[in-house]
Structure formats: C-alpha cells, structure tokens
Amino acid sequence: MDPVAGEQDEKSYGYDFIWETAGKQQVVSNYCFYGDYLAKKGMLEQVRDFFSQGGGKNGDVANHNYDKALPWPFDEEDYIDVVTGCVAREQLRAHPAEQPFYMMVSFCGPHKPYDAPQRYLDMFPLEREDDFILPEGQIISDEDKESLYRQRRSAKAMIRLIDDQIGETLDVLRERGMLDDTLIVFTSDHGDMLGDHFMIQKGVPWKQSVGIPLAVRLPGAAPVGENIAPVEISDIAATVLDYAGLDAQRVLSRSWPAYNDIIPSRSLLPVLRGEQERVRDFCFSE
C-alpha cells in the first residue's frame, strides 16, 4: 500500500487533488502522504517507533493486548489529524470561491492507538466510572479497567481535537463567503466498544460499534432536527450528486468505479428538506 505511488490511479475516481494517509497503525509498515510529511521533517522513524509501542488489536479485553493510551510526544502541529486539517484548509484557500467543489476530509481519530496530545488530554479528567455493559457474570480486572479508562479519556480528547479542526475549516469557508453555499456532511465509519460487552475496537454488530452519527447541514433548508430512520454511508454519494443537480442513479450505475447495482445509494435530500421521513426501511452493514 503506497498512496503516494498510486496517486494517479486514485485520481481516476474523479479527484483533482489527493493527500491520503495510510492511518496511524499502517504508517508503521506502509508509506503515504503523511509518512512523506514526517520523512521530510526527519520524524518518520520516531513516529513509527511510537506507534509500535501501543495499539492493541480488535477482540476481547482479556487478551491484554490493549492500547497503552500514551500521549502524543511530538509537536501538536505534526499530529496526523492536525496535519490533515491544515492540508484541507490550504486547498480551500486556494480554490476559486465562485467555482463548485467537492472535498472529502477524513480524520483518522478517534482511533487506536489512543494518542491524543497532552493539551487535549488535560481538558478531560481521568474518570474511573465502572459503567461497562458486560455479559452476565463477566468481570473486568482492575488492570484492564485502568487501561480502558485511559482509552476513554483519550478518545474524548481526540474528538475534541477533531472538533477544533472542523471548526477552523468551517471558519475558512465562512471567511471566503462559501459557507452558505456548501453542503456539509459529518459522519464516521464505525464506533468503538471501549470495554462494553467485554470487547475493544470494532467489528461486531453492537450499537457501540455500528451506531455512528450522520449530521448534515443543507444550505437554505430549515433544520429538521433528529431523525432516527436508518441510513447507510453509501447514501452520501447519491445525496451529494443530487445536491449538485446530477442524476445520481445514472451516475452511480456505471460499471466502474461505482457499484450501485450491488449497494444502492439513495439521496437523503427529501428527508433533509422535510418532504419525507425516510428513504429506506432497513440498512446493510458488515
């Protein structure tokens, strides 16, 4: 996996600019634009050593292969999600304000290894609340609880850091007069068990793992509040295309790279405009 070498292949999906990270764990063994950034600053091997220290695998708590939740030991400006936010804002500042654009900004956190910078950790006390949802008769050792408490704290800190990065990015849109014309979609790919059901990380069909947020700001539309109808991440594609005035089903029915014949994508604009309550009765997840 080398996003730097495969940049032209990735542009075949329609992007004019790509700056991709392999992820905190993958940067240990793979190269990417974030790895290139670190290498140019002479930091790559140091960061790889740090990432190799802590980061357990998916599975149950009992395997003791849990994350050490060590704070990021380098400058905050070099943290993966801070760099990602800075690159996004650079692109927005360079883009002609009168031209339409599509931008996907994918932050790595909150994700293992739990490595929030100390400044953000200091915003949250280390709460030792033994409120884990567990199978009947299941017990978590004090050692494992302490690790999970640290992970929970770091997850909150990483979310706060991402909040700040999103806020700064919205500020750029506002400063350039682009905010009121921009459809904004906020979501994630998965949640985290963080000790519930005696599990860590993801990959199981519990609410903590598959229940993720989808928040949308539609310019010119009155807020419709909270809607608990099921949606899929794939619905974002049709929603964006529909908002851009394109025939989503025609565009997504191409043989490559789309796969709409396998996982249909449905526009959420009717829901966002308050015209209907839902676009699907069930969703698919794996």
Which ranges hold each PLM region?
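Acidic, His- and aromatic-enriched active-site or binding-groove loops in soluble protein domains
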Residues: 2-28, 126-133
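Active-site-proximal cap/lid insertion segments
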Residues: 24-230, 242-258
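Catalytic core of tubulin tyrosine ligase-like
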Residues: 236
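Active-site glycine-centered loops adjacent to acidic/histidine catalytic or metal-binding residues
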Residues: 1, 189, 286
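Short, solvent-exposed loop/turn segments at the edges of secondary structure
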Residues: 10, 207-211, 263
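Short beta-strand/turn segments that mark the catalytic/cofactor-handling region
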Residues: 275-286
